[in-house]
Design a protein with these regions (language model features):
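C-terminal and inter-domain tail/linker signature
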Residues: 1-144
Length: 144
């Protein structure tokens, strides 16, 4: 197993178990995490820590499962599923919408693109997923 594959697996296992410290250890000190659908960007360790703690407070039962994962010495891609129950506000989701969805479960499929640092950590990641589909599951958008 490539070291970066192991790193991504460790990262997603940590978020699924609410292990903030292990999750943070996967990222370079100046890492950038961009959630494209939410237009949310966390830059640097403080923003990463604040962001993940806020996420886990809002969705404490977050579960991520890997569908496919490919890495090399510099880049990686991961297709995943995520599920959870919304318990509060999430960065990128207006509070009035979050309030309508509290207590509701969701699941989604998405993908993350990675760039790794010279010391073997995540330098940059960009997450892509179906925002409209999730909002439909949460009952705030009509479903087809």
């Amino acid at each position: 197993m490539h070291p970066h594959e192991k790193l991504v697996r460790t990262c997603l296992t940590a978020i699924s178990s609410g292990d903030v410290e292990t999750w943070l250890s996967c990222y370079a000190a100046d890492a950038v995490s961009e959630d494209v659908p939410f237009r949310s960007v966390w830059k640097g360790r403080t923003a990463l820590e604040d962001g993940v703690r806020s996420w886990l407070k809002a969705i404490p039962d977050t579960r991520m499962d890997i569908l496919s994962l490919h890495t090399n010495d510099h880049f990686g891609s991961c297709e995943w599923t995520m599920s959870g129950t919304l318990h509060g506000a999430v960065e990128g989701l207006p509070p009035e919408i979050a309030a309508l969805a509290v207590g509701k479960q969701f699941s989604m499929q998405g993908a993350t693109l990675y760039r790794f640092s010279a010391d073997g950590r995540i330098q940059r990641e960009a997450l892509y997923w179906d925002l409209a589909g999730v909002l439909g599951q949460l009952g705030v958008l009509p479903t087809p």
